[in-house]
């Protein structure tokens, strides 16, 4: 399917930066219109660095759109179940990539299905006991973990056969899990308890919580998480605004200032850049994190109200879902 692009040049806002910030002069933005909208209900996206493909679960359309970030071509995996709720149509809503497969969570039938990245062919599926929220691949154990906040639990799927996910365990938590990150070197998993204002650290191999950190995000709690593999810093977004930087023992050693309404964030390890989108004021904030956990603003770019999640490709290009308008904002930061 051919993509429709609307080009605009968005000036970076220098006023929002600290005086010593390395502010970009401009950011080029493209708007990729998605089929079946508007609206197109989007939440968790997934990027495969090997193929350069961006997987975009598009809930109400019954599609998982796939953007080739190298060529700009848009394709899709079709035929996903949808279901009507009181206020919207739900369907595929989350995705993660590992070992040549994308694993797609569907809120319509509580399933997780494997999609072969190369052929975009759907393979095996498994049904969960609760509606999936976030889906993430845990490389050290060859598993896919799924946050199921309604049951205050994590569902663990074995993908030793990557085409055939299999439910193998349930981890019950003290609250509803929200967001995720993985330390592949140390086999650690991180997730937040949104209703408890905490971040949990889990031993992926032992399948248990080994520590928890108090965050102080406030009544709306924490949302997205990212992890710096080199510095071992954990970045935790607060829904009320801002991203806190935690060291390995949970001390807050830095803070990235953002507008309110932040959800999923992302981290570009190769450039030590942290990305956070604020849905309340429609901005993307990019900051550079130092070895000590301190952060320095690089750019603040105007996006769109409601754009509260961001994912980044290997080149540093940011992708922000705009569900209301049925499009994906593509923002290239000039430095």
Where on the chain are the PLM-derived regions?
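Positively charged n-region of N-terminal signal peptides that target proteins for export
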Residues: 1-4
């Amino acid at each position: 399917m051919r993509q429709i692009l609307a080009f605009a040049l968005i000036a970076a806002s220098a006023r929002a930066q600290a005086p010593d910030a390395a502010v970009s002069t401009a950011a080029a933005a493209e708007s990729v219109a998605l089929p079946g909208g508007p609206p197109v209900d989007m939440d968790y996206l997934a990027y495969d660095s090997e193929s350069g493909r961006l997987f975009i679960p598009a809930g109400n359309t019954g599609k998982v759109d796939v953007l080739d970030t190298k060529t700009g071509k848009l394709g899709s995996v079709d035929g996903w179940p949808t279901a009507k709720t009181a206020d919207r149509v739900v369907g595929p809503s989350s995705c993660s990539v590992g070992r040549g497969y994308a694993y797609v969570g569907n809120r319509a039938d509580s399933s997780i299905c494997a999609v072969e990245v190369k052929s975009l062919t759907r393979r095996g599926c498994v049904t969960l006991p609760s509606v999936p929220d976030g889906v993430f691949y845990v490389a050290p154990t060859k598993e896919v973990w799924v946050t199921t906040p309604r049951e205050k639990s994590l569902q663990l799927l074995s993908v030793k056969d990557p085409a055939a996910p299999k439910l193998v365990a349930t981890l019950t938590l003290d609250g509803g899990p929200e967001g995720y990150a993985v330390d592949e070197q140390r086999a650690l998993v991180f997730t937040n308890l949104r209703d408890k204002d905490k971040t949990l650290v889990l031993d992926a191999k032992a399948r248990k919580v080994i520590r928890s950190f108090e965050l102080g995000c406030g009544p709306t709690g924490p949302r997205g998480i990212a992890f710096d593999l080199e510095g071992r810093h954990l970045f935790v977004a607060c829904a009320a605004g801002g991203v806190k930087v935690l060291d390995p023992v949970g001390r807050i050693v830095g803070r990235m200032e953002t507008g309110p309404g932040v959800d999923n964030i992302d981290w570009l390890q190769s450039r030590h850049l942290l990305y956070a989108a604020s849905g309340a004021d429609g901005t993307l904030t990019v900051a550079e994190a130092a070895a000590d956990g301190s952060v320095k603003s690089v750019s603040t770019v105007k996006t769109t109200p409601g754009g509260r999640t961001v994912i980044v490709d290997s080149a540093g290009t940011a992708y922000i879902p705009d569900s209301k308008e049925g499009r994906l904002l593509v923002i290239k930061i000039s430095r």
